[in-house]
Amino acid sequence: MAAIRFSCIDSAAAPLFDLSGDGGRTRTGFEPEAAQLVADELGRTLEWVIVPWDEMIPAVQRGDADGVWCGQGIIPSRQEQVDFTRPYAVFNESVLVRSGDPARAPEDLRGYRVAAITGSANMRLAETFPDVELVPFASSDDVFADMIEAVRSGTVDAMVDDDVVTVPLGDQPEFDLAFTAETRNPWGVGVAKDRPEVLEEIDGALARVIADGRLEEVWKKWMPHLPFPAEALRGGTS
């Protein structure tokens, strides 16, 4: 049986995934291990299609990958491009600043340059902050690392991303966690709209690994500091 192919970036964004040493063929972290559960459930090998962030959905639309499995918040702008499975994760969103920055609420960010990934749920949140300058990141091979470096260097004053990756960064001496917004952002696997059979296949496998507790085990292995969103996932909604 043919491999199942998921598109993603190759980046150091622990605990979601770490930078691969072989171009993305071998990956570690919550995202790759959760995807492996689905591949195993389907009896197929798993193949990663590594592309820049803004090429992940086009890769699926072209047929180069079967789905986008890479931090895809289920938001309207993406739902216009692909169909989504049930959620396999639910996260809040946090704002990261440099160490010593006094910002602790959205209104404290007035006049700040705030980075977020183009077209993401994080950018939608950043757009609600009053009087900030939005700095979109999208096209590089490692967009997450680029945003972190932009905060570190002072190119931007803050960045918005999901709490699963920003909260650990806030523990590093050069950064502070400004605040977390309780957005309950659901993540799913995006599949081309003209491949409903692939969507059904992946969604069914996800339902089974959620129902029998296998996904929860992987969650607790990689993200023990975050409670598993059992009710949201087992209900198939956010």
Language model features with spans:
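Extended ligand-binding regions for polar small-molecule ligands
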Residues: T26-E41, G100, E107-R113, T118-A121, ...
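Alpha-to-beta junction loops
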Residues: G43-T45, Q61-C70, Y112-R113, V151-D162
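Extracytoplasmic small-molecule ligand-binding "clamshell" domains
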Residues: M1-G71, E80, S140, D212
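Acidic, polar ligand-binding/catalytic clefts
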Residues: T45-D108, E174-A181
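Short helix-initiation/N-cap motifs at beta->coil->alpha
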Residues: E47-P58, D101-P102, V135-A150, N185
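Short loop->beta-strand "edge-of-pocket" segments that line small-molecule binding or catalytic clefts
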Residues: A3-T28, P106-R124, V132-V135
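Periplasmic-binding protein-like
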Residues: D10-S11, A89-V97, V167, D171-A207, ...
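Ligand-binding clefts/hinges and TM-proximal coupling segments of bilobed small-molecule sensing domains
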Residues: A121-D142, L177-A178, A207-S238
